[in-house]
Amino acid sequence: MLESINFTGSFMTAQLRYDLHCHSTVSDGTLTPTAVVERAASRGVDVLALTDHDEIAGLAEARVAAARSGIEFVDGTELSVSWRDITLHIVGLGIDSESPALVAGMRAIRSGRLGRARLMGESLARAGIHGAFEGAARFAANEQLLSRTHFARFLVEGGHVRDVREVFKRYLTPGKPGYVEHVWAALADAYGCWSALRFHRRPGP
């Protein structure tokens, strides 16, 4: 998400380029936190937020890289929660990454991911695709955060589908062979960690 804002005044006109929603290899991105910052700098970004899924482990590295690149950095994350049988992804910006409530809340959210990933591997094996769990794990730099995106990359690499979009359509959405329903922390239960966030909300898949 790369956006720009134009500022105009009596004596000046300026454009601020910002990206406030990006992921690194700490969750399901393909670039390290440092590489994310370097990519943003090469594209003229002035303000950058790293918002990995349910993780803040990449913030310190990204913050150092941003200072080196002259980019204003915003600590962020993207929390996964359940509300009325719907999964929501809450993007928090300007967070307190040392907040005990936030750290504990994200740890609880992450705790079910590995079990879900194993069930996804078993489900895909029953559909004739073997070694999916181990294959997906090769794409995950953070073993605590194995996601559907990592399974998608494995399936594309193995030639089972043409691209990630087709993976989700054929295997990783409700009713498909590799989909495993997961209930995240309830929206109400996640409230305790929100004191560390200034957030906006968007629906998630």
Predicted segments with their positions:
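Noncatalytic linker/hinge segments flanking ATPase motor cores
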Residues: E55-A66, V91-L93, R113-S123, H130-R138
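A short alpha-helix capping/helix-coil boundary motif
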Residues: A14-Y18, R39-R43, E98-A101, H130-G131, ...
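Short, flexible active-site loop motifs that bind/organize anionic cofactors or intermediates
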Residues: V26, R107, A141
